[in-house]
């Protein structure tokens, strides 16, 4: 919501100010790399109804076994150098799935954008979309 200052609702993903089990579907498109993803994942799980769906996209390098993050990297310039963008705090590796599952989500599916979907949905070619479910 910080990108769109005119948003109807602005929420802190690390401390979502709504009651438990309020949403059927949540789309988190390129936000988890900006926040404490453990806190955010727990909050997303809390506000989803049982069986609710989390659709998620993050910058990920599948060839990396582990997520790259370093709390000592704090300047915008250094974050841009290390994480590709000045407000990112990590670059995910193949362990991304397990990081989200550790919060209680079940990985239902994942898609790699290609062909007509790239244009139709405004995705980057080769971008991963993950679909998790509250178990």
Predicted regions: what is each one?
Residues 66-87:
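SAM-dependent methyltransferase
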Residues 84-110:
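Short alpha-helix
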Residues 19-31, 80-82, 105-112:
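A broadly tuned preference for mixed-charge, low-complexity surface segments
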Residues 1-73, 94-100, 129-135:
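Conserved SAM-binding loop
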Residues 22, 86, 125-126:
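Exposed loop/turn and edge beta-strand positions of beta-sandwich/beta-sheet ligand-binding modules
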Residues 103-135:
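Core SAM-dependent methyltransferase catalytic element
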Residues 32, 36, 84-88, 120:
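Conserved aromatic-histidine-acidic binding/catalytic patches
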């Amino acid at each position: 919501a910080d990108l769109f200052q005119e948003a109807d609702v602005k929420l802190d993903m690390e401390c979502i100010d709504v009651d438990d089990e309020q949403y059927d579907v949540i789309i988190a498109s390129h936000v988890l790399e900006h926040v404490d993803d453990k806190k955010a994942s727990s909050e997303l799980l809390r506000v989803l109804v049982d069986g609710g769906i989390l659709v998620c996209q993050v910058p990920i390098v599948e060839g990396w076994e582990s997520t790259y993050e370093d709390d000592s990297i704090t300047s915008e310039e250094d974050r841009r150098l290390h994480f590709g963008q000045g407000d990112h705090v990590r670059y995910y590796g193949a362990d991304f799935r397990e990081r989200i599952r550790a919060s209680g989500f079940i990985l239902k599916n994942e898609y790699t954008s290609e062909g007509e979907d790239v244009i139709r949905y405004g995705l980057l070619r080769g971008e991963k979309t993950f679909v998790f479910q509250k178990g």
